[in-house]
């Protein structure tokens, strides 16, 4: 089975903004065709191939459904894979802002200030949404994979910061 990218599997143009309803419809349409239950009485080989396709489709669907995974897939497709462990392309200014925010979260937790925690959480979520819009523009309008990758790393950083609220 030749390696296919998630966009090819669903017949979608490789771009960041996707129609979620169209993706869902395609997923169920394709899944019906290759679901292993349809091949229960088939040969072992056919059953194994159906299982492989079902797994491939599920993995592709998960990648395309999650904006970070979709962005990482686009970066890889465009020759700019993202190393999650590296913050090298994130600006020092952004990192300093996040350090200050992390301290504010810690202070609010220590003092039991739930109102301040909620304000901080909403600010992170808003910044994340704005960055995802910037990622979409970088990929789909500007075709600037480096900018998209930098913004995507920022989103990943903010996601980790949101874990501080759990």
Model-derived features: positions:
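C-terminal accessory/regulatory regions appended to core domains
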Residues: 1-166
């Amino acid at each position: 089975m030749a390696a296919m990218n998630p966009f090819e599997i669903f017949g979608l143009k490789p771009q960041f903004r996707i129609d979620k309803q169209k993706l869902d419809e395609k997923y169920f349409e394709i899944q019906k065709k290759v679901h292993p239950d349809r091949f229960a009485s088939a040969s072992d080989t056919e059953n194994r191939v159906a299982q492989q396709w079902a797994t491939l489709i599920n993995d592709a669907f998960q990648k395309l459904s999650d904006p970070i995974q979709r962005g990482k897939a686009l970066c890889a497709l465009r020759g700019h894979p993202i190393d999650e462990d590296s913050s090298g392309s994130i600006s020092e200014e952004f990192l300093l802002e996040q350090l200050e925010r992390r301290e504010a979260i810690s202070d609010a937790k220590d003092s039991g200030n739930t109102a301040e925690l909620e304000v901080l959480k909403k600010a992170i979520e808003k910044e994340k949404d704005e960055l995802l819009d910037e990622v979409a523009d970088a990929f789909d309008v500007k075709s600037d994979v480096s900018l998209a990758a930098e913004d995507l790393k920022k989103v990943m950083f903010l996601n980790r910061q949101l874990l501080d609220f759990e």
